[in-house]
Amino acid sequence: MASEDIQKKIKEEAPVTWQKSVMLYLHDLVYLLAVVMIVFMLLFRIVIVSGSSMYSTLLDGDWLLVTGSVLYQEPKHGDIIVASKDSFNDGEPIIKRVIATEGQTVDIDFEAGIVFVDGVPLEEDYTYTPTNAQEGIVFPITIADGCIFVMGDNRNGSKDSRHPSIGMIDTREVLGRAVFLLFPGTDKQENREFDRIGALK
């Protein structure tokens, strides 16, 4: 009789124990996901490309993983950065490539389409077109302390540091560096090339 009572008690308690285990597991999982999301938001952000100023490196609709300012402290030549400048497009984020940093001098031969930094012509295999479009800034120009000079890879279809509404960008206006293409946008023929997914150069 006692044995039957024990077995009955075990059967009655088993579902409760299982349910509690599941609830504890779900509680821990939700807590872990919340922590991961908070850390991710502090260290990274996802930005969607709008427009063709970085063509053909980046396409309209590309999803980019961007390191936040916590991880990205010092912009350097060649970095693809995301910045927000109040004087341009109501502070909407812009995506450009760093051409020069503080103390460097930028000059552009618009006829030849060549960019010079400290007198040295840049080898720019990432550009879609030569730099022929002059937007209003007078060159040569020396980059002020705490600032960077940026341009889009689609040089004749980009509003960037050549334009007075953008000019030099204060490094405090830099939101982060684009490091990885998560999901591809579409090209001019509306094709989506998934083999573009990967680290950005």
Task: Indicate where each model-derived feature is located.
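Extended hydrophobic leader/signal-anchor segments used for secretion and membrane insertion
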Residues: M1-K201
